[in-house]
Regions:
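Short coil/turn linkers that connect adjacent helices within long alpha-helical scaffolds
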Residues: 11-12, 52-56, 90-96, 132-137
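Residue signature of alpha-solenoid helical repeat architecture, marking inter-repeat boundaries
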Residues: 15-16, 38, 58, 98
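Structural motif corresponding to the intra-repeat A-B loop/turn of tetratricopeptide repeats
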Residues: 31-34, 74, 94, 114
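Amphipathic alpha-helical segments of tetratricopeptide repeats
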Residues: 45-50, 86-90, 128-132
């Protein structure tokens, strides 16, 4: 066995780093403290950069959702909405609607928290439509 067999390829090292950043970011979100939200934001930003670097659209969506959750936890609701809308936009390029229903519900909830009931209602309607579509499949 030569030494090359023992070394990770740059791609697999990047994939491992990406997966680790996403995993650790999700774990920090569960702590629900400001320092944990700040650290998770850093990890999801790192994951987003790595996902874009390797061209992994699924991981890009996951990192973007993580950024939204981190920002929401830090009280940046408008930033969270912007990231969740990015997730919905990505569906058009990826062709995969996984996670869209949750994103729609989260956007509706955040608009409710902001007191913007008109937009909240709009996104709750979209959320319910998406739920009904999922149940029909």
């Amino acid at each position: 066995m030569d030494s090359m067999d023992l070394e990770e390829s740059p791609a697999s090292a990047t994939d491992a780093e990406l997966s680790g950043a996403l995993r650790d970011g999700r774990a920090l979100l569960k702590e629900e403290t400001e320092p944990a939200f700040r650290r998770s934001l850093e990890l999801f930003e790192k994951a987003l950069t790595l996902a874009r670097m390797v061209g992994d659209t699924t991981q890009t969506r996951r990192a973007t959702r993580g950024l939204a959750a981190s920002k929401r936890g830090l009280g940046d609701r408008k930033g969270a909405i912007a990231h969740l809308k990015e997730v919905l936009e990505m569906r058009k390029t990826v062709g995969d609607a996984a996670g869209d229903t949750d994103a729609l519900g989260a956007i509706a909830d955040i608009y409710t928290e902001l007191g913007d009931l008109e937009n909240a209602g709009k996104f709750y309607d979209l959320y319910l439509d998406a739920l009904n579509s999922e149940m029909m499949q």
